């Protein structure tokens, strides 16, 4: 049984699209729909299962209860629906475990997940506060610890926390989640992400990712495993994992982003263009796709395209550190060294990752400053430092003994 990720399923929320069209876009055989009504004397929940091939109504049921314990009602309904789906498919349904018995903790957790999925620095910080409040109500709430771990990793990528701060907090929270619930696959995945990005211990991390996936971890874990495989030069395995991630979450551009880097490490330009097109198809105005289009264009000396995309980012996302980075890259592509240096100075003022500064210096052929910034990236345990073995931006300085020493330092040689 394959269930698509939340982000892809929620892409259709409230849009009233035909179930057959949804089935085609998500590549699923059936769609489960539901509604919730609070009435004066209780609660009514209606669920229906429709076949996507022809819209045929497979099953429906209404659940009515006067119980005030919403968590108990949720567990009962979830187990009932799971059993019915398994009856239609054939086979026994696994019992669905209630993550907490404390209604206040559960409500705070749901608020935290809402903030988490808004994907902004401020909302992610708010999510951490809400998850911590949930834990205060129920210290055994493993999923709330998982929420903290995932949020801390995102805050590192958003440059709101240093790698040292964020990854250590993420590991601590994920380890607590695993201690409370050893079968929580995504918690093992967060351990893998934090440990690989910070400790560079591939053998241990590989086991953690594989454990996570064996327990049914979601798309972010599979993406992270695919990314880690790419940094080790295991490109075929990386592509396989990232394509599975795309099947799990077909409406998200994130798997295509990670596969772009895999193609980039392979110097496969056609593959990179394909991933750019896929990101644009899914979210035409997604800044991640636009920034990577600059990366590809600069590497291919397509400076006019790089300038156009960088200017778009500058207009729409001027405060994003990545925007200043691509503006510097585009200036370097055009041969405008003073402008590139000005943008690099702005990147530093905004607290951009040292790895991005190193790319800027490499593009203006400043070998010493590029290697100096790469050393700072390694000192800070930035996740991007694991790109150095295959990153095309550094081909010009790859043979420098100082560069080779950095590869050895982070465990890539």
Place the predicted regions along the sequence by residue.
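Acidic, proline/glycine-rich low-complexity intrinsically disordered segments
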Residues: 1-319, 339, 391
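Glycine-centered helix-boundary capping/hinge motifs
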Residues: 25-27, 365, 411
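Short, ordered coil/turn segments that flank beta-strands lining enzyme active or ligand-binding pockets
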Residues: 52-54, 363, 401
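Helix-coil-helix junctions within alpha-helical repeat/solenoid scaffolds
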Residues: 284-289, 294-375
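TPR/TPR-like (Sel1-like) alpha-helical repeat modules
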Residues: 315, 375-382, 411
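Short arginine-rich
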Residues: 354, 382-384, 413
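Right-handed beta-helix
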Residues: 379, 383-391
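Terminal, low-structured helical/coil segments at or just beyond the last alpha-helical repeat
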Residues: 388-413
């Amino acid at each position: 049984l394959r269930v698509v990720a939340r982000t892809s399923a929620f892409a259709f929320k409230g849009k009233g699209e035909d179930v057959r069209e949804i089935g085609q876009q998500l590549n699923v055989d059936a769609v489960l729909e539901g509604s919730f009504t609070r009435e004066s004397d209780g609660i009514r929940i209606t669920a229906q299962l429709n076949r996507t091939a022809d819209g045929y109504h497979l099953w429906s049921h209404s659940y009515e209860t006067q119980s005030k314990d919403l968590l108990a009602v949720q567990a009962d309904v979830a187990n009932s629906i799971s059993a019915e789906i398994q009856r239609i498919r054939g086979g026994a349904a696994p019992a669905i475990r209630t993550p907490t018995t404390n209604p206040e903790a559960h409500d705070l957790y749901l608020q935290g997940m809402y903030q988490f999925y808004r994907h902004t620095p401020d909302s992610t910080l708010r999510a951490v506060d809400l998850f911590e409040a949930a834990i205060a109500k129920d210290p055994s709430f493993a999923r709330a610890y998982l929420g903290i771990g995932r949020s801390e990793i995102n805050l590192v990528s958003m440059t709101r926390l240093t790698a040292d701060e964020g990854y250590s907090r993420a590991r601590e929270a994920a380890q607590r989640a695993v201690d409370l619930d050893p079968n929580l696959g995504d918690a093992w995945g967060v351990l893998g992400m934090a440990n690989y990005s910070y400790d560079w211990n591939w053998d241990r991390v590989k086991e953690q990712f594989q454990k996570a996936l064996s327990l049914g971890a979601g798309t972010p874990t599979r993406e992270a495993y695919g990314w880690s495989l790419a940094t080790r030069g295991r490109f075929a395995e990386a592509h396989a994992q990232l394509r599975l991630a795309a099947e799990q979450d077909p409406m998200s551009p994130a798997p295509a982003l990670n596969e772009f880097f895999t193609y980039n490490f392979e110097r496969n330009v056609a593959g990179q263009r394909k991933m750019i097109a896929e990101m644009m198809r899914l979210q035409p105005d997604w800044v991640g796709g636009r920034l990577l289009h600059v990366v590809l264009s600069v590497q291919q000396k397509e400076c006019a395209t790089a300038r156009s995309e960088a200017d778009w980012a500058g207009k729409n996302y001027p405060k994003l550190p990545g925007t200043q980075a691509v503006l510097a890259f585009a200036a370097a592509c055009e041969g405008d060294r003073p402008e590139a240096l000005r943008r690099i100075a702005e990147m530093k003022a905004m607290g951009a990752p040292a790895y991005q500064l190193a790319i800027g210096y490499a593009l203006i052929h400043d070998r010493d400053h590029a290697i100096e910034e790469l050393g700072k990236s390694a000192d800070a345990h930035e996740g991007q430092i694991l790109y150095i073995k295959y990153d095309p931006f550094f081909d010009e300085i790859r043979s420098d003994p100082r560069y080779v020493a950095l590869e050895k330092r982070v465990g890539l040689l």
